[in-house]
């Protein structure tokens, strides 16, 4: 009787041990099944259709090797009371694991397979902007140029943005929105978005960078003048550290009634985008309210009629926080990107002759 009782106890103990081992093994397997399939970081595009059941979602994830086991995925969903998985197109990786995948499915997809990323560099003009947009969207070059000069559109912008003023009504401006579109990388919903949609994004970004200067004491200048100056500084200065000093040079010359003498404004006036092309004497003398190289006195003490390129935050800050000095001239070594500043013309001319061979063609 005692032997039978002992035998029963041993059997029961064995059963309990086996159950414990089974539970532990199951838990280990379950936890392992929830882990990442591999260490791969390659994106996989999957589509969860509207109305898909949890089982169908599990099958889709397994098909793309994003989960190890459909059953454990379903168990995880049940145990965690998940019932709000969202449909859509997702980018997922094999190294995510079930928890991250479920979190993503609960949050919903932010991935758009039709999304277009478009980049506008600092210091480019409206013609170059038009080329970039026409190459990356369904809009034509002409669509962009026309929108940049659209009077009705400009009227709407005046109501929306404090920095869009009546100065843009000037018919002599090549492109009314030149210099007002902030250079950056933008994400577009698709290639079919309108030029106005793109411009609105760029203008909203410009507003962010100008906001701190909304109540600036402009004295006898306006925001349009500061943007014109900033675009000159953007194009003239190889490095940002020289820009506030360079801005002061132009304003010093303006205060003395001199022409501002900026080569980049002459290049813009002639609509020459080839940076390797040296300007001729005739091009430097082109009669234009953009050309600050004119020697006939018509541009003495005057900024160009408007901005000549996109403008970085560095150049914006430089003109609003210009240095205080007496320099009237500067010249840069194109190769080393070092800029030299002078108070008198003879010293400037000496350095210019010294750098003539280095800067040939610029």
Model feature map: region roles:
Residues 3-41:
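N-terminal type II signal-anchor transmembrane helix
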Residues 6-10, 49-54, 277, 288-291, ...:
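A broad, low-specificity signal for short, low-complexity segments enriched in glycine/proline
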Residues 30-206:
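Signal peptide-directed extracytoplasmic domains
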Residues 19-24, 41-56, 120-126, 158, ...:
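Short N-terminal secondary-structure initiator segments
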Residues 134-142, 153-362:
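Bacterial extracytoplasmic/cell-wall-associated proteins, especially those involved in peptidoglycan
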